[in-house]
Amino acid sequence: MPVARPEPQEPRVIAHVDMDCFYVQVEQRRNPVLRGQPTAVVQYNDWKGGGLIAVSYEARGFGVKRSMRGDEAKRVCPGINLVQVPVARGKADLNLYRSAGSEVVAILASKGKCERASIDEVYLDLTDAAKEMLLQAPPDSPEEIFMEAAKSNILGLLSDAGEKEKNVRAWLCRSDADYQDKLLACGAIIVAQLRVRVLEETQFTCSAGIAHNKMLAKLVSGMHKPAQQTVVPSSSVQDFLASLPVKKMKQLGGKLGSSLQDDLGVETIGDLLSFTEDKLQEQYGVNTGTWLWKTARGISGEEVEDRLLPKSHGCGKTFPGPRALKNSASVKGWLDQLCEELSERIQSDLNQNKRIAQTLTLHARASKENERDSTKKFPSKSCPLRYGTGKIQEDAMKLFESGLHEFLESQNTGWSITSLSVTASKIFDIPSGTSSILRYIKGPSSAAPPAIPDSSSVPEDPSLDNDVFVKPIHEEQCQPSMSEKEDNNAHSASAISAKQRQANEEKRISKKLPEVKGTSSILKFLSRGQSTFHEKRKSDGLICSHQGLVDCMSREFFGSKQS
């Protein structure tokens, strides 16, 4: 459900940058012959030519759509170039596109807080950069940057095509603008500067939305594509939302949006204005009702998270129609490949970024034989993540078996799996320093052995309530050794101070792991996938913690400084 967050008192400048048919651009950079040609990137699948996942604007002009498959696209546009995504382990390998996206992120992050939302889209909080520009007299911005900013689409600014740039320049330069609009104008110039840099340094074009919050910036970033940007002044918000279809709003594309249409007769966001906050709360609960009331007014307090790295790693594969998996052997074969890729990615994250993932989750889509219309879904299953390809493969299969047993409800019937995915989540940074890492892994000493999570137990982390933790694979590895029992007995004495207990604990771990010296040794220790690592983290509760502008700009726009 959506969360109603309070909006900051100070005005913000938020941008949503969206790459233009990014996969196609990456392939065009690899093979410049494709530039200007109708091109589409197809997913790994030879059925009917494969599914289209990106379509160039040249191909769209012929009527090619992403919902088509390769064979249909060729019928619509015989001259289309179909480029297949790279393949690894029998499935699409997106590392080429992830790497290209990282090039773009490195540039965009130079101007403020940057949140990487996906391979090809980013949120930016440019508030500080806009304020700094507003205080400059004159600011340092070349004419070509201002020219790019002057091409912006300003919502609510009426002008014919011939007068557009002139009117946008006037809007950017106007001396009577309020503080919020002046910040937005600076944001438009900063985004234009970043987009020019991205094009020069990567050969990629991108579009952007600039507004006072993430919700509005996201909504308008795709309004004028390709290679354009759109600005939403506060004075234009209501008119913009008045005609926006409910299903176009994030969080309203599913059941909640359908409920608004069916129960309240709401078809556009503007229609929500006729309902009081109390009425919406009565219908949908306090939190959701408040969120709907604020959304109708363009209010959103969601902040840009300063995150350049993904919050999770996932690998998946679909098996449509006759490709569905119908026995455990075929499921295991594909799970092993998915887990191998996942293991490589989390190991790379560990080595390069010093981050550890805590939770392994398995998702699947399934159907029972002769029950094609069944509404029961295959349950997602989670367990503490153990590093090492073999361990991940073993645990993932156990998760699948647990989910299948629950899905079938003890019925002796056939089944089909049409989608499989494994995800590593709950990622945290490793604290610097060997002793800190040891403390973080082990936590405070306990006289009791680690508890064994059962499939019926409720996860301690509220965000994992929809998942079920299954019993660890090797229960015997959870039992304390003789030396551990002795230490636990010793530590139970109340006369030992907390400081002394911590010293004894680190000494005990050091004896057990004499090779651990510095962070690199710890990384090696973790990569070996010691069973005590994930079990002790779970038992200790660690799973849930954790440049000049044109003269008019200089004279008029910056004539009155703001503090």
Predicted segments with their positions:
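Basic, low-complexity intrinsically disordered segments
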Residues: 1-563
